[in-house]
Amino acid sequence: MAIRSFKPYTPGTRSRVVTDFSEVTSSKPERSLVVSKHRKKGRNNRGVITCRHRGGGHKRLYRIVDFRRNKHGVSAKVAAIHYDPHRNARLALLFYSDGEKRYILAPADITVGQEVISGPDAPIETGNALPLSSMPLGSSVHCVELYPGRGGQMVRTAGASAQVMAKEGDYVALKLPSTEVRLVRKECYATLGEVGNSEIRNTSLGKAGRRRWLGRRPQVRGSVMNPCDHPHGGGEGKAPVGRAGPVTPWGKAALGLKTRKKNKPSNKYVLRKRRKVSKRSRGGRDS
């Protein structure tokens, strides 16, 4: 997979950088594995906006992805690599030997025709799913379960992988992409390898319209609003925030405030907290 840049024929193509989709082998999804999904547009069950700047975009069909990998001992062949509009990662369509079809997250370097399998005795190969107790130290894994049998919940974005650091008792220490080191039960399953399409981080939409196609609406700075709309609003000209620090539209501290509960029960499983992200690298903007 590679990325493709464009000559500045128009203002929209001047900064446009996209993936070339060379790894995608089929343009149509498997009909038995797609369902329609009502788009919430950032609203909850009462119609109140709970997530701003969402709405519009192209219509989508949701692909049913197998995050559990619970067909143990049944081999499957990779039939195709598909595009998924709901995530940056690609999907691998598996044809199992018993006739069932399933989607999984496509690992990096997986090819059509390759065979994958899940189970405690599966070979140590990319795309196979094993319990963490069977993973060699130093292995790169993705789609990691937090609780046995619940399905992969961590390390699922494009290009992400976690590293098996140590094994002790009933737990395995994983180094997550955020550099956090966390203990996970050894019975939890994970898939070997890293998630494919890692070049997505080097892409650029190029124009506001492409962001609208993805269902993202414009994000307006609070400092250019009226005082009735945002705590940062009002004043003559380019006025400062007027507070000790930036706040959300509802007056809560923003940009750097820790939101994790101090007495969360799962804190005992975190051996090392994730690194602090500086404002320069975060590239934050006015709320």
UniProtKB/Swiss-Prot annotation:
PANTHER family: LARGE RIBOSOMAL SUBUNIT PROTEIN UL2M, RIBOSOMAL PROTEIN L2. One of the primary rRNA binding proteins. Required for association of the 30S and 50S subunits to form the 70S ribosome, for tRNA binding and peptide bond formation. It has been suggested to have peptidyltransferase activity; this is somewhat controversial. Makes several contacts with the 16S rRNA in the 70S ribosome. It comes from Prochlorococcus marinus (strain NATL2A). InterPro entries: NA-bd_OB-fold (IPR012340), Rib_uL2_dom2 (IPR014722), Ribosomal_uL2 (IPR002171), Ribosomal_uL2_bac/org-type (IPR005880), Ribosomal_uL2_C (IPR022669), Ribosomal_uL2_CS (IPR022671), Ribosomal_uL2_dom3 (IPR014726), Ribosomal_uL2_RNA-bd_dom (IPR022666). Pfam families: Ribosomal_L2, Ribosomal_L2_C. SUPFAM superfamilies: Nucleic acid-binding proteins, Translation proteins SH3-like domain. Residues 258-287 have a biased composition (Basic residues). SMART domains: Ribosomal_L2, Ribosomal_L2_C. Keywords: Ribonucleoprotein, Ribosomal protein, RNA-binding, rRNA-binding. Belongs to the universal ribosomal protein uL2 family. Part of the 50S ribosomal subunit. Forms a bridge to the 30S subunit in the 70S ribosome. This is Large ribosomal subunit protein uL2.
